Structure formats: C-alpha cells, structure tokens
C-alpha cells in the first residue's frame, strides 16, 4: 500500500486538524476499497487565500498549461512533485476525494482526461451520499464529466476503472468528438476551450 505525508502549513485548531485527517482517511479508504490502491502523493493543507496563492505561484511552472488556478481553488494536484494542495477552509469532503483520486490515475493520461476521470469517480463513490459531492460548474460538467460518463457507458465500469489506473488502453478514434477531445494534447484542448467559449 502507498503512504503519503500530511503537512499543515499553519497552526490548526484541534477540530480543524481532526476534520482534515478524518476526511483524508475516509477518502483514502473509499479509494482503496474501490480501486485496490491509494495515492502516495503528499498532502499539503493550507488555510486561506494567501497560503493557497503562495502554493500556486511557487509551482505555476509545474501546473498544466491550459489550467487556470485561483486562490479560490479548493485544491490542486502537482503531478511533478507528487503533491496535493488543499485549502481546508473551503474544501469539502468531495474535494479531498477528487484530488486523492488524481493521485492514483495513470500517469500518461492528459490532464483533462484525468480531470474528467477524477470527477466521474468522485461522483460514483459519493453516489450513496450525494451531499458529499461538491457542486460542479457547467464548464466542468460539459468539458470533463459528461464525456467520461459517455465513455463509461461504452466501456463499462470495470474496464473504465482499469483504464483510469493506466492498466488498460483504448483507441480514442472510435469515440465521439467530445470523448476524443479528452485525449488531445493539453495545450490544444485548453486553447480550443478558451477559443470556443
């Protein structure tokens, strides 16, 4: 099993510490039960927009080219450094689950595909308790989640899970345009999204 460290950037109250570590433990257990693995990414917990801004600015060159992060982001994942950064004052359980899923996804998937897979599986794992799923913007739903839902209906849940982990492969040419777009180079995908908005 994988192991990750949790680092709090600033002093937390006992209740805040307990909430964060409980969310991480429960999310990791859900992921392990469903996928049979869990992330080894370290988790950095920050509080407030200033701490999040420092994290974003310090790693902006590691983040994906088309992605736009703000201090309002609840969480981000830095694949190069294998770190998940969570802004605990605004993150809900679903944000922790979503980012921890990012940590187990196949390394060769482009960012937008990882984003879609992570939100899709967050939705699947929170289905019994839908209140745990954060509300998603129309952009996230249309760009990431809807195409992955279509992919799941074609491939089936088991195969999609293997594919998400990087243990199975697909020929994206066989799918509709919205699904194929998830396989584009990141720069092309995000340029198209900005241009056609």
Model-identified regions with their sequence ranges:
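N-terminal low-structure segments adjacent to metalloprotease catalytic domains
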Residues: 1-15
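Pan-zinc metallopeptidase signature
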Residues: 4, 8, 134-197
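Auxiliary, metal-adjacent structural segments of Zn-dependent hydrolase domains
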Residues: 12-90, 110
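Stable alpha-helical elements in mature extracytoplasmic
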Residues: 23, 27, 92, 96, ...
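Amphipathic alpha-helical segments that form well-ordered structural scaffolds
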Residues: 26, 30, 117, 147-151
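A generic hydrophobic-helix recognition signal that picks specific residues
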Residues: 91-95, 108, 195-197
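Active-site recognition of the HExxH zinc-binding catalytic motif
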Residues: 94-107, 118-119
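Post-HExxH zinc-binding segment in Zn-dependent metallohydrolases
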Residues: 107-146
